[in-house]
A protein has these predicted regions:
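Bacterial Sec-dependent N-terminal signal peptides
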Residues: 1-23
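Glycine/tyrosine- and acidic-biased, solvent-exposed loop/turn segments at the edges of beta-strands
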Residues: 17-248
Length: 248
């Protein structure tokens, strides 16, 4: 009985000692060693990772607030330069997004994935937390949906959108987040619908409307919206009639 009591006390004290080794500070009051955080209400594990005199070290894991405690994100500080590589997961373990954070802002390439898929939905590039370079968005069939050039977080350059079959829908240009220069819009088959020019985000000059590859109307920029409404109504009626004919 005495021997059993001693063993029990040893196990209990060992457990307490192990707990004492978690969430500790160094002599300067900086977090040091293994740290674990918990969800406020459930008290389930929220994260775990290691600090070295106040600095994150290695891989930190973050858990959802369920009994399963699924890993929903990791932050890798292995470079030791203060940066961390973040990977976000859904509750089935599929990647949602991943990329680098430096000084608490996005840096370099970031990837976003289609739901429950390894296929990339969006690729974008950051410099000091701002979008820079070409941002691309993809359909689930892997065809390009959109490509936009950014500089310092603003659209600067080409902006093209495509349908799921890879046909160009819009061919635009931006300067400091405002439409500038020639803009061309297409239908789903690659034929022009209308085109014109922009300046400082506003339509200028004459705008042309097309049917079957030929110009059918040309209007001043200030009359574009009114003409567009009539043009689209005409297109919808023509499309509806075509569909009716196809059902006969």
């Amino acid at each position: 009985m005495k021997k059993f009591l001693i063993q029990t006390l040893f196990v209990f004290s060992s457990a307490l000692f192990a707990q004492d080794k978690i969430n500790q500070f160094d002599e300067k009051g900086l977090r040091h060693g293994v740290w674990k955080g918990y969800h406020d209400e459930s008290k389930r594990p929220r994260y775990e990772g290691t600090f070295e005199h106040g600095k994150e070290k290695g891989v930190f894991k973050y858990f959802d607030d369920t009994k399963a405690g699924t890993v929903i994100a990791t932050r890798d500080f292995s470079k030791g330069d203060g940066s961390c590589y973040i990977v976000v997961f859904d509750q089935k373990g599929n990647k949602v997004s991943e990329g680098l954070v430096v000084n608490k802002v996005y840096e370099g390439e970031w990837k976003y994935y289609h739901k429950e898929s390894k296929d990339i939905m969006t690729i974008e590039f950051y410099k000091a937390g701002k979008l820079n370079g070409t941002r691309k968005v993809y359909y689930k069939n892997k065809n390009l949906a959109e490509e936009v050039v950014y500089k310092d977080g603003l659209k600067n350059g080409i902006c093209k959108t495509y349908n799921e079959n890879g046909k160009l829908i819009e061919d635009l240009n931006f300067v400091n987040d405002k439409l500038e220069g020639k803009a061309v819009y297409y239908d789903g088959t690659g034929s022009k619908l209308y085109e014109g020019n922009n300046k400082g985000g506003a339509k200028v000059g004459n705008w042309k409307f097309y049917e079957n590859g030929k110009v059918v109307k040309e209007v001043k920029a200030e009359k574009f919206s009114k003409e567009l409404a009539k043009y689209e109504e005409k297109r919808m009626k023509a499309l509806a009639n075509t569909q009716k004919e196809g059902k006969k």
